Each structure stands twice: as structure tokens, then as C-alpha cells.
Amino acid sequence: GYERGYRRGTENLPGALGMAAALEAGGEPYMHNGAWKLMAEFAAEVRAVGGTWHSDRFDRPTCYINAIAMPGLSAKAQVMRFDMAGISVSQGSACSSGTMKPSRVLEAMGVERDVAERTIRVSLGWNTTREEVQRFCEVWLDMAKRA
């Protein structure tokens, strides 16, 4: 057996415990980097121009990964325009990167197909700055006004 005969399989228990300790020690910046405030501000901007903030469907959403839909512009077009502006976003989940189809997760959530086709995924990291979020907001809002 594995893990000195205590369990079957290939789980790396020492590795998992080490990762848990590292996350506890290093997770503090995530809690205090202002990401919640940044995303709340951006969500208000998205709603103000008629966009859809999919996290509104949840009681306890995350501030680090969000799906937003822009009125009048496909996700594919948004991804290309953000890329030209030097900003990385995606259409769909990380595990389906490269796919240009609406997310099955959004479909399962009951999101209408036309809204899903206009939805992009936006992620914040532990080191995302207020300036980067503001730049993203400016580009997104400019796109929404032109759509």
C-alpha cells in the first residue's frame, strides 16, 4: 500500500499538508488586497451599462473569478479586443481554454444562450492592482458603449 500502508492510491498526503500550510501562510494578501472592493466597484459599472454580472446569482460569490456579459458584443469579439488592448480574458472556463463555445456551466445555471455567447471570464490574482482593474473597467466600458 501507499503512505506506509495506511491508504490505497497515489495521494500525496505530505504534499497536501504542505500545500495547506503554504496557503495558510501566504493567503493573507488575498484577504486584504482590496479585491472584494475592486470587484464590487466593477460590478456596479457593469450593471450601469446593462451588462450581466453572473455572480449576482450566488449567495457567496468569489471576487477572484467572475463571468460577465456585455450587451451587444460576442465573447469572441471581446476576447480579441481585450487582447489588442493588452488585457487577458477568456471565454469559458480555464479547463476549456481554446474553446469558442458558450460555457456548459452557464447553460447549467440557466443562463440564456445569447447571454452565454456574450459572456467572458475575468480573473484577479493576488497581485492585481487597483490600476489594472480600473484599466480593465475603462476598456470594458468603452467597448460596451460602442457595441
What does each model-found stretch correspond to?
Residues 1-32:
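Conserved core segment of the aminotransferase class I/II
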Residues 1-2, 12, 23, 42, ...:
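Glycine-rich beta-alpha junction loops
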Residues 8, 31, 67-68, 94, ...:
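Glycine- and other small-residue-rich loops at beta-strand/loop junctions that grip anionic moieties
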Residues 14-24, 43, 79, 83, ...:
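Predominant activation on well-ordered alpha-helical scaffold segments within soluble catalytic domains
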Residues 27-81:
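Conserved PLP-dependent catalytic core of the aminotransferase class-I/II
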Residues 66-121:
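Conserved C-terminal alpha-helix-loop-beta "cap" of PLP-dependent enzymes
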Residues 101-147:
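PLP-dependent enzyme catalytic core of the Aspartate aminotransferase-like
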